[in-house]
Each structure stands twice: as structure tokens, then as C-alpha cells.
């Protein structure tokens, strides 16, 4: 790296914009090592009418979590009969992300938006790897819990208070999501638009360090 190079400006005109995708998954276990990815839901944050939803056949070699089933309410028998092959399904999702981004914002880069993003990202990045497809989001992801904590964090806000039921008390949405991957993704999109606007109104311009 060149020494004493002037720092780049905080923002540059003409840089590619991001195309925000709200994404949610449902699974049959806590990690990809012990369970299966069973459904993927997604929509554009700024046009939630553009949606994707798919249910996947569970991996027969993985355990099935009854605790998780009580949350997502998808039975193993239903998914075995009606689910799509998981490799095919993940490839369809990657194709949809790329095609949708190119259709609505051809100069943009897809940005993954989630609520407790590490969980959903963990499952999808493993699924993309297993399917042999490039992650359409690259390494770009946003966590709405983190944005909320940044906006409202302090001595009286612990990370445990960023669970969705508390966040929705501050920023209620018009939607009722109940662990259906698509419904959750659409609800997240509304929350993302709200938090983004709040962040814009409270934006502190970055101060770039002076060169030494």
C-alpha cells in the first residue's frame, strides 16, 4: 500500500449503488451441521411486490428438530412430498437475486438485509457452497438488529433487548409475520425502510483521518 497517500473522500459520486434484498430462512436445526435449510423467502426492500419463496426437501441424513417445527410449522412429510431439491432450490434463489437486481438496478450490487443476519447468512452461505454457486451477495450483508442498537444503544439497552418483539414496539409494522420465510422477509423490508430513514435523519458525516 502506498505510504502517505491521501485518504479517499467519504462519498464519491458515480459509485455503484446497492440493491437491498430482505432475506429470511427457516431451518430444521440450529446449524447446518445438524439440520436442514427448509425454506427461503426474499423481497426487494424498496419494492416488496418482487418476491421469492421456495420450500426445500430436507437432507435425509440430518436430524429433524421438533422444537424448530413448532416455530415454522412445516412438517417433514410435507417438505418431502412438496419441497424442491435443495441444490436446485438454492440455485434458483441465486438466479432470482441476480436477475432481479439486473432488472431493477443494473448498475447496482445486491445487498443482503436480515434480522439477526448471522443466522440466515450462515445457512445460505453454506447452501451456496454446497450447490457450487457463487454467493450473489458476495460478502455484503446488513443486520437490522445492529442498526437498531446503533440508533438506540446505551446503558439501558442490552443486546437481548434487540429481539424483534422489542424492536417492533418502537417501530411497529403494518404486517404480521409468524415465521413464514416470505412473510418475515416482507416485514423486514418495511422495518429496513423505516430504520434507514431514521438513520438518514440522524446521520453524522464521517470524519476522515488526516494523512500522517
Regions found by a protein language model. Give the residues of each.
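Acidic, Mg2+-coordinating catalytic module of metal-dependent nucleases/exonucleases
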Residues: 111-118, 122-123, 127-128, 160-212
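Short, glycine/charged-enriched secondary-structure capping and boundary segments
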Residues: 36-38, 126-130
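Conserved non-catalytic scaffold segment of RNase H-like nuclease domains
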Residues: 2-118, 179
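Acidic active-site catalytic centers that drive phospho-/nucleotidyl reactions
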Residues: 24-26, 120, 143, 184
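Active-site-proximal helix-loop-helix substrate-binding element of RNase H-like nuclease domains
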Residues: 57-65, 69-72, 76-79, 142-186
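A short alpha->loop->secondary-structure connector
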Residues: 128-138
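Conserved protein kinase catalytic core
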Residues: 30-32, 149, 190
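The first long alpha-helix at the start of the GST-like C-terminal all-alpha domain
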Residues: 115-117, 140, 144
Amino acid at each position: 500500500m502506498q505510504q502517505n497517500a491521501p485518504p479517499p473522500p467519504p462519498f464519491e459520486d458515480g459509485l455503484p449503488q446497492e440493491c437491498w434484498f430482505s432475506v429470511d430462512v427457516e431451518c430444521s436445526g440450529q446449524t447446518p451441521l445438524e439440520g436442514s435449510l427448509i425454506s427461503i423467502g426474499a423481497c426487494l426492500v424498496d419494492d416488496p411486490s418482487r418476491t421469492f419463496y421456495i420450500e426445500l426437501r430436507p437432507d435425509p441424513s440430518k436430524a429433524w428438530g421438533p422444537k424448530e417445527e413448532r416455530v415454522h410449522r412445516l412438517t417433514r412429510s410435507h417438505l418431502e412430498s412438496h419441497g424442491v431439491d435443495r441444490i436446485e432450490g438454492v440455485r434458483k434463489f441465486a438466479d432470482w437475486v441476480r436477475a432481479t437486481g439486473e432488472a431493477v438496478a443494473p448498475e447496482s450490487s445486491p445487498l443482503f438485509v436480515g434480522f439477526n443476519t448471522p443466522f440466515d447468512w450462515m445457512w445460505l452461505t453454506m447452501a451456496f457452497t454446497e450447490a457450487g454457486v457463487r454467493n450473489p451477495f458476495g460478502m455484503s450483508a446488513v443486520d437490522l438488529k445492529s442498526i437498531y442498537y446503533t440508533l438506540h444503544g446505551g446503558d439501558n439497552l442490552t443486546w437481548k433487548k434487540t429481539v424483534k418483539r422489542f424492536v417492533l414496539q418502537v417501530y411497529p409494522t403494518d404486517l404480521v409475520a409468524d415465521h413464514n420465510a416470505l412473510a418475515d422477509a416482507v416485514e423486514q423490508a418495511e422495518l429496513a425502510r423505516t430504520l434507514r430513514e431514521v438513520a438518514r435523519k440522524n446521520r453524522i458525516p464521517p470524519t476522515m483521518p488526516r494523512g500522517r
